[in-house]
């Protein structure tokens, strides 16, 4: 199909959806879209990794940062203008950058299936313990329905909102959903064997693998190096957690675990602000596009490293968290995520 025909059809779909618009409906769609923004992802990952479940937080963090970096690279390669650039009549909200694929759709299809699997799926409800039977008949457990709604329904709803708001063609949303679901399914299927394989590598080889992945993403990302830097720093921080010790998120009282969040945000903000100051000073002394991109990469890499490694170390030093031997950590994490009655 000719791309122009596809985009014309997409504009027709957007116009048809917008004929039902109202201030209230538009507000609802903007609220739905918020649940697939970087700020919301950031909050979810930090809350999980620092306070609730470090293993799930780490997986979701790697997945959403990688998915976002991949989305940025593809957008820079395709360079498809947004629908409201092609037809100003569908303009409702301002969005920067290119259109294809939809970042909100891809991000939600990456995050929410993993959230449903590793967070919501960590425990069975009472109905599941009974084998899903009710009145002698087998029914789909409520917890399974909830996980399906989160894993599939929410990404579809977010994609719908992006079309309604006129910031993406239907084809953008479909492309983003496919990429996101492929990413989340890949994490679910291959995370454990890949992690087991890489864990036997030397730290230098692990670092080389991370550097190669980030380098390849950088080749297609144009001037957008932020997420690539965050991915590098986040994975570098994981490498720094050696095989003898792991950050134990479950240690501490509820208040101690809660205090990690404002403390970690403050430390991350200071580190990020420091590198922002360095970046601004360097640009005033010797400005160049290459220097600007490098400093932006370093700034976000530092942020990812602080979140992944330095903040947990600070929590441990201040008595807000503990470390445990990796073997014990794995057993404890397995116990936390294993459904009751299934653990060996």
Briefly describe each language-model feature range.
Residues 1-40, 71-99, 252-263, 267-271, ...:
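N-terminal transmembrane-helix/juxtamembrane module of multi-pass inner/ER membrane proteins
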Residues 21, 63, 222:
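Charged, low-complexity surface patches
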Residues 28-29, 42-50, 58, 68, ...:
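Membrane-embedded catalytic cores of phosphoryl/pyrophosphoryl-handling enzymes
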Residues 51-81:
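Membrane helical hairpin/interfacial module
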Residues 53, 236, 307-310:
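Hydrophobic transmembrane alpha-helices of secondary-active transporters
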Residues 56, 130, 335-337:
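Low-complexity, compositionally biased segments
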């Amino acid at each position: 199909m000719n791309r122009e025909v596809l985009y014309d059809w997409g504009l027709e779909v957007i116009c048809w959806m917008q004929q039902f618009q109202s201030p209230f409906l538009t507000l609802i769609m903007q609220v739905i879209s918020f649940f697939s923004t970087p700020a919301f992802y950031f909050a979810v990952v930090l809350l999980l990794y620092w306070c609730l479940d470090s293993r799930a937080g780490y997986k979701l963090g790697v997945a959403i940062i990688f998915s976002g970096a991949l989305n940025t690279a593809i957008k820079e390669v395709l360079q498809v203008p947004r629908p409201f650039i092609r037809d100003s009549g569908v303009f409702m909200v301002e969005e920067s950058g290119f259109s294809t694929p939809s970042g909100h759709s891809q991000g939600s299809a990456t995050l929410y299936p993993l959230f449903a699997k590793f967070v919501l799926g960590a425990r069975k409800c009472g109905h599941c313990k009974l084998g899903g039977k009710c009145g002698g008949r087998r029914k789909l457990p409520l917890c399974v329905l909830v996980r399906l709604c989160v894993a599939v329904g929410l990404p579809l709803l977010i994609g719908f909102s992006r079309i309604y708001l006129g910031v993406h063609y239907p084809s953008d949303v479909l492309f983003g959903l496919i990429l996101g679901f492929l990413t989340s399914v890949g994490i679910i299927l291959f995370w454990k064997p890949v992690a087991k394989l890489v864990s036997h590598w030397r730290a230098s080889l692990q670092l080389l693998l991370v550097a190669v992945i980030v380098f390849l993403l950088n080749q297609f990302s144009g001037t957008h190096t932020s997420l690539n830097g965050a991915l590098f720093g986040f994975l570098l921080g994981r490498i720094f957690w050696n095989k003898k010790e792991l950050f134990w998120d479950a240690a501490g009282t509820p208040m101690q675990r809660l205090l990690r969040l404002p403390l970690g945000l403050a430390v991350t903000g200071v580190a990020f602000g420091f590198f922002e100051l360095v970046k601004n000073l360097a640009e005033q002394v010797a400005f160049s596009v290459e220097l600007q991109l490098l400093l932006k990469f370093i700034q976000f890499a530092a942020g990812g490293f602080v979140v992944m490694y330095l903040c947990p170390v600070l929590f441990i030093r201040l008595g807000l968290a503990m470390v445990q031997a990796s073997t014990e950590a794995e057993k404890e994490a397995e116990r936390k995520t294993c459904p009751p009655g299934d653990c060996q």
